[in-house]
């Protein structure tokens, strides 16, 4: 019997059942289709272990035109619309970067990394959303910005499936131009720089326009990132271009004041690139024209020189140095989580920077020479060497203690002190929750030297529930609980701007009591993290350097 000829009440029931079946099919479909403002995309259904329901993934969605040809060293432009349904079931190519397989650190860490294609056409994002989510679900959104010193990394590095399924939130992972292509600046109108940051802004604008189609709430967006990704998040907090694009910020082991990732001036990078390029250009306009004509291989050869590359004060994305913007209160007053790991320079960072073999040879005799060289790299005047030795090394002669204190000094200078400074600036206008991640993952103990505690990046496993590139390891029961707690803290923050919730150890806001959370298998509240070191780096050292310089100039006059 045709549907239209059924009795009225039965017709209503039949239509209701059809709609229900259609809705269920839409939830659990192996090939979900969603709209975007430039066309439709087809994703995949993924079952997530230990969760009631699976998720839908949409991989490699373009949020900007390919930044090639005349768009190399230019702001991103809106993507072109497409007809039909675009396939979004495979990971996008990474942005051009040094082949991570060849890095000493990866070999030494015994990590298995699957080769991923690279392309200059790389401005894509991935979306992970609960399978039941639909337009109107209004789920909180978290946008992940990967780390890698602004020279390495990809959206595929961190699999957000577990976090999205466990906490029922929409997660977006974005890519941005890296290295020379992402951050080269001529210091003038020919190439202002910060292209990678402008890509991130374009991705955040795309989220505002489109995330509702995937079940997300564009009025509840939290940006989060680790290392250089944390630096990126922190830079959006101070950038006028990012206003209204997010409502909460999480900075994991990276803020806008990280010394190697922000620069007032572009001269050093400019000269290096100009020399390596062989362009022999008389001015910046000619240099950019020449660089736009370089092949992928030629750009990669230049890139290899940079272990990290700084963003610049370009007058647009960053109108002033982040320190000035923070000090003057010129930033977006959004709630923040800011944190560091116990041993930021315990192993991974020194290996990556090529410092590990130097640190291993430190003795009382060699220490001054090593410190002199390191101080120059850290842009610190030679006058500070004795002060740093006194503060960190004291009178000890033991080489192992000296090496450990040197690593602590590096970690404080590069990560801890900048994070504390940013937290103190931001708490004047919005809640800040500070943490120190202290747990050494059990599965990695055998690979690392015994002195290393929670190293740079160890927290990320407990945020996503998997290690880099989706690698999973057996966790202890205590670690499983820590993982669930960290995920819940992060998701609660995305939902309400406050990480606290039922069945979670209390996390106090960072106020004048200087309380913070020690994130460990047994979380505890700490007070005044590294207060003496903060005083040393921000007050004592600058003051003594000024005094020394003053006495030297008087001596020169005499």
Swiss-Prot record:
Intrachain disulfide bonds: 95-122, 279-290
Single annotated GO MF: retinyl-palmitate esterase activity
Record's subcellular location: Microsome
CDD domains attached to this UniProt entry: Esterase_lipase
Regions that span the bilayer: none
Pfam families per the UniProt record, alphabetical: COesterase
Active-site residues, record numbering mapped to chain: 227 (acyl-ester intermediate), 344 (charge relay system), 456 (charge relay system)
GO cellular component, one term: endoplasmic reticulum
Keywords tagged on the record: Disulfide bond, Endoplasmic reticulum, Hydrolase, Microsome, Signal
Function: Carboxylesterases that catalyzes the hydrolysis of pyrethroids pesticides. Hydrolyzes permethrin faster than cypermethrin. Hydrolyzes retinyl esters.
Protein name, UniProt field: Pyrethroid hydrolase Ces2a
Species of provenance: Rattus norvegicus (Rat)
Gene: Ces2a
